Amino acid sequence: MNNFRATILFWAAAAWAKSGKPSGEMDEVGVQKCKNALKLPVLEVLPGGGWDNLRNVDMGRVMELTYSNCRTTEDGQYIIPDEIFTIPQKQSNLEMNSEILESWANYQSSTSYSINTELSLFSKVNGKFSTEFQRMKTLQVKDQAITTRVQVRNLVYTVKINPTLELSSGFRKELLDISDRLENNQTRMATYLAELLVLNYGTHVTTSVDAGAALIQEDHLRASFLQDSQSSRSAVTASAGLAFQNTVNFKFEENYTSQNVLTKSYLSNRTNSRVQSIGGVPFYPGITLQAWQQGITNHLVAIDRSGLPLHFFINPNMLPDLPGPLVKKVSKTVETAVKRYYTFNTYPGCTDLNSPNFNFQANTDDGSCEGKMTNFSFGGVYQECTQLSGNRDVLLCQKLEQKNPLTGDFSCPSGYSPVHLLSQIHEEGYNHLECHRKCTLLVFCKTVCEDVFQVAKAEFRAFWCVASSQVPENSGLLFGGLFSSKSINPMTNAQSCPAGYFPLRLFENLKVCVSQDYELGSRFAVPFGGFFSCTVGNPLVDPAISRDLGAPSLKKCPGGFSQHPALISDGCQVSYCVKSGLFTGGSLPPARLPPFTRPPLMSQAATNTVIVTNSENARSWIKDSQTHQWRLGEPIELRRAMNVIHGDGGGLSGGAAAGVTVGVTTILAVVITLAIYGTRKFKKKAYQAIEERQSLVPGTAATGDTTYQEQGQSPA
């Protein structure tokens, strides 16, 4: 019997250990098992992962990969997951090409061309924040150069995912967290979690990967070389090819070391050169093409990628345990988060290097290259605030209010009109002691105190003042840049204002630098072209609109001005306009990463959704009260659930329940009263019985009294 119990316990422990292992550990076990059995390497170039299409960076694993069947590529060279299939290249696919890239706007990635060229609303900024692109753009602009690129590419496999692939456990868990927030109407928290999902898994999922290796040389030449050269573009690309062949030893029979006049001129005009080995053995000077190609076998990498947007994989087939309508809401929430990521990293401006309005940081052209600047008067900013909740010790508006220095009040000076830029809610958590009396049976009372966390809220409204009529010269404020807790002032390269300027508070943490000293402050003054936000446009774009503030205005800058991001305030971007050519120096900005939405300080109360009905296919889902899992409901269960929801079942309504509670309390009070009364009456009867018993023996009582009296009189 003991042996039987021991066996049962052993198998239970083994089953628990097996079920308790994370999926990642199970994959490691499967990989090692296959490597031991087949004595083959594992193919590491795999699709099914997340991809950031702005930065060209691999992200977290979206699709689950397992190695239970120990599958191999068709040529038997590598172990591959069960959910992957490969298309081997039966013949050696060695490609060599040379190209001229005259502008960074036409740049194409060497390793993610296919996924970057997808057609979408934001495809123009795909790859614009990759290290490869930013290096090339910086060199082209700073050196006034063009780029030539020569590359040798060797494609070995095309690796694709199986359409029946399942989501990874980590990605699936994050989707379930978002769905849980959505079903409980916690939209703000769901938005925040969706933005975290984009941060961890990117914007796309790779569905196909080209595995191989590439050897690339990029040369940057003075732009004047191509313009002044009497030869054709083909001659320049040929010179680039010769330079590459001198770097990599091709060992051709024909001697390419002899340089003609054009090749020598090419080399003399080269301002920068880089050779990059992607896959294969590491590059070193003098390496032969044959040696590099032979080292590819065990050093495969991705040399191109294809994929689909992240939300495409959030569908009922991938999440069969959730109701269809809820899955669609999750997919839409994630899609919106991806669009917001693209929007906040789109920098409109003039992209023509030859234009005086050129904006180095712009990655999309907005047609502002031809505009001429107009001087505008800046009437200042101010911010109103109204406290909505909180006690007297938590005064939020003291650090949110800002008066206009030109008026000393929350207003604009004469000749200026206010532009309501944005209204938002500011939240701060605070703790306070909350005490109340707690009584039992209305008799036993005590004071109970507890430390309670609550949220104080205040609404702030930001305004800036635009000239609505002719105003006297030097009547407004000088603008000296701005900064926040996460950005610096381009005028000072620090979180500060120039000399002679003072900061005005706007939003929660933006500081706008202004000056009223036209004599000393003009040295650092910057021509200002207005503000605009995600909700309100810039009335200075059209002078006629600035006179009629009731008319809608465009969310852009007037001619001759370039836009720059001021800050992202709780998911809303606020931009400002300055004279083109200013604030565009230095290095290119990195990608602004999510989340952009603040999470709520306190979780909203759950509505405890228990049933979801899909009107399209008349299917209803019920949430199990024990397991909290969704499942398709049976007709009987649906009727029972609806009865509970609408109060038609056997349960009591709120009023009935209250009546029963009052009745039970009354009966209990009566019983307690009767018990107290009965106890007192019983004690009274017992006392009378003793008196009657004492009266039957009077001598005893008299003797006692006499003795007491005698004892009291004897001393006298």
Swiss-Prot record:
Source organism superkingdom: Eukaryota
Task: State the protein's name.
Answer: Macrophage-expressed gene 1 protein
Q: How is it modified after translation?
A: Proteolytically processed in two steps to generate the Macrophage-expressed gene 1 protein, processed form: cleaved by trypsin in proximity of the helical transmembrane domain releases the ectodomain into the lysosomal lumen to orient the pore-forming domain toward the endogenous membranes, and processed by the asparagine endopeptidase (LGMN).
Domains: entry comment: The MACPF domain includes the central machinery of pore formation: acidification causes a significant structural rearrangement, leading to oligomerization and deployment of the transmembrane beta-strands (named TMH1 and TMH2) that enter the membrane as amphipathic beta-hairpins. The P2 region contains beta-hairpins to interact with target membranes.
Against PROSITE patterns, the record matches this protein to: MACPF_2 (PS51412)
What is the associated disease? Immunodeficiency 77: An autosomal dominant disorder characterized by recurrent, persistent bacterial and fungal infections with multiple unusual organisms. Skin and pulmonary infections are the most common. Patient macrophages show impaired killing of intracellular bacteria and organisms, including non-tubercular mycobacteria, Pseudomonas, Candida, and Aspergillus.
Q: Which SMART domains match?
A: MACPF
